[in-house]
Regions:
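Conserved, non-catalytic sequence blocks in retroelement Pol enzymes and Pol-derived host proteins
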Residues: 37-42, 55-59, 110-115
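Proline-anchored loop/turn motifs at beta-strand termini and strand-loop-strand connectors
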Residues: 70-79
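Domain-scale recognition of soluble eukaryotic interaction modules
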Residues: 1-19, 25-26, 51, 64, ...
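Conserved catalytic and ligand/cofactor-coordination microenvironments
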Residues: 55, 73, 86
């Protein structure tokens, strides 16, 4: 973070909360979670890139993925938009080929107590629980018809075993 104060288009509680979360992720990163250098050097807190590595002894062991977090002024009372980005989007039954993630804590089960760190851990746990590398059965149709914002999708959470 270079000790510089981050500039942001966010106000008040969102800025303070994000500064605190970023500081924690930079100084005390969890295994498999690293804030990208791009985020650490950014002048705006509304967009983060977080690099995650597939957990040991899982189908995704050692694979590197990037998550995009988009925050607005309602954070932490409203969830961020979280998607996989880049060339390596995991083939997982709850991850669409456009990077959208079907995970209830990103929408209906969001709580202000959740953090970027806890969201990343939940996503890594989701990856770790996979029993096969495959796209969701409706991937083609969903990707063709969905909004760019996954929070606008009407998710149907029905399968916690993959």
């Amino acid at each position: 973070m270079n000790g510089e104060q981050k500039k942001s288009t966010l106000l008040g509680p969102a800025v303070r909360r994000l500064q605190k979360e970023l500081q924690r992720l930079v100084t005390s990163p969890a295994d498999g979670i690293k804030v990208s250098d791009e985020t650490c050097n950014a002048s705006d807190l509304t967009s983060w890139k977080v690099d995650v590595t597939g957990p040991k002894e899982t189908l995704f062991e050692g694979e590197n993925f990037q998550l995009s977090f988009q925050f607005d002024e309602k954070y932490p009372f409203d969830s961020p938009i979280v998607t996989f980005t880049g060339d390596n989007i995991p083939k997982h039954p709850h991850v669409y080929s456009n990077g959208h993630i079907c995970l209830s804590i990103l929408t209906t089960d969001w709580s202000p107590a959740l953090t970027v760190h806890s969201v990343c851990l939940s996503i890594l746990s989701m990856l770790a629980s996979a029993t096969k590398k495959a796209r969701p059965p409706d991937n083609f149709l969903y990707v063709k018809t969905c909004s760019k914002n996954p929070k606008k999708s009407s998710w149907w959470y029905h399968d916690d075993k993959v």
